[in-house]
Amino acid sequence: MTVTRTDTRPFGIAYTALAAAAWSLAGILQRQLHMGLASQLAGRAVFASLAVFVFVAVAERGRVIPAFRAIGRPGLAVAVLMTISSGSFITALSITPVADVMVIQALAPLAAALLGMLSGEPVRPRTWAAMGVAVGGFAVMAGAPGRPGLAGTAFSFIAMFCYAATIVVARRKAEVSMAPATCLSQVLVFAVFAPFAHVSEMGGVNLGYLALMGVVQMGLALFFLSLGARLIPAVEVALIAQLENVLGPLWVWLAGLEYPSVPTIIGGVIVIGAVALQVTQGSGARARLRRPPGDLLGDARDPGDCTLKA
């Protein structure tokens, strides 16, 4: 069925904004944990993989194995990219101030735009302008005291590039359900870090924070991203998701763990303005989807749909 892009675009924006809000909890939740990095990653991966697996089982009406087989090479690529991005992002947060990591994540729209161009996606002049404003806002935020170390910078860039690549693959392969790929990515994270984790560190309050990181900050965020990336161009997804980088430092500030400088506040306002510029952009372009835009809970057995069947 053919539907207008203006019909589906609000849903793509909403899904991506929800992903950004969930992702923004990473810094504040990570700061509450008192355990080694391997235990953090392995523990979060357990909850994330279980949450997404349950979703896949319900959405596919018990046909879990066929669902995982259907992802093919694109789904495997997304799973690997998500694995690397997840591990690198939390590693960066553990050794670098939240605001510094967020500044580097702001480059994702540019990376996604370049990758999208290579795969044939057009980029409108207004989108380029909005991206420039967003990056400029984070450049202002970078004026805050302190610079990230080499290791923190490296892990932040790795996470950013893998995140951008995930957006492009998900958009270009809209017929592939990314829910099983999301689950697989967390299984891979667990497999990599579990041998170095310590179960004794995961009790008490730590267990609750790990559950929040796995189910909300990781599982739901990646799921909403996979939905949003199928409804709007890769570069728009990457730009709207920059709200994560504004909200992340905000939560840490509200908790009294880090206090933003004036440049950070000014930069955050600029970024919000850039996002507003992008999401209010009208378009008469058309896109072909397998379901009507009003069917938010479409048939998940359709390989082109990773949403839940009510």
Predicted features by range, described:
Residues 37-48, 90-108, 149-161, 205-218, ...:
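Structural signature of hydrophobic alpha-helical transmembrane segments
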Residues 52, 82, 126-143, 155, ...:
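Hydrophobic transmembrane alpha-helices of multi-pass small-molecule transport proteins
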Residues 2, 45, 242-310:
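C-terminal-most transmembrane helix of multi-pass membrane proteins
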Residues 1-42, 80, 84-88, 136-139, ...:
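Glycine-/small-residue-enriched transmembrane alpha-helix faces in small-molecule transporters
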Residues 100-107, 170-188, 218-254:
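Helix-helix packing/entry segments at the starts of transmembrane helices
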Residues 56, 91, 108-129, 246-266:
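C-terminal transmembrane-helix exit sites in multi-pass transporters
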Residues 35-84, 109-115, 162-166, 182-198:
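Transmembrane alpha-helices of multi-pass small-molecule transport proteins
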Residues 11-19, 63-90, 150-159, 194, ...:
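Loop-to-transmembrane-helix transition segments
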